[in-house]
Amino acid sequence: VSDSLRHRLRALPDFPDRLPAFDPALAPKDPVELFLAWFENALAVGVPQPHAFSLATATAEAVVSSRMLILKNIEPAASGAAAGVDFGAWQFASTRGSRKGRELGINPRAAMNFYWAGLGRQVRVVGEVSLLSAEASALDWEQRPGADGRVNPDWQLYELHPAEVEFWQASADRHHIRHRYVL
């Protein structure tokens, strides 16, 4: 089975035949601006669920887990913040009692990873996570698709404050391009 699987996996294409160009020298100073440009491109070419990302968290013992979530919003950098001092606040939500909620309660560091296979692109966002207010969490719960008016006191809106945002563009020649913003 192992050799058969290995051959089948090796036969699969890694990336699409046509990949978008990316020149890091032309990237904006603000990673949110570049993310939004890549996100809009993913929407325009029909990438399914471009707002979905994998969230990796860890326990106090460094046991890592990840799961798929939906990006709720990106709040812009604090007004008056100098360039490169604040990469905005990337929002997502879950129940506090879930595994991710418990892990974030113990270890508030996390990583988001957006992957747009059809474009050969991914964006990794790493930083500290904080809880938003009960009011903001309740409003997010009420605005969910299919909301039925019931209250969920365990629902929590979180925001990740990036210390690092990395953009990765696949290249057919395997000289993949990375562009990192680090605070």
Features from the language model and the residues they span:
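Short aromatic-glycine-enriched beta-strand elements
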Residues: H51, W90, I177
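Short beta-strand or tight-loop elements
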Residues: H51-F53, R67, P108, Q156, ...
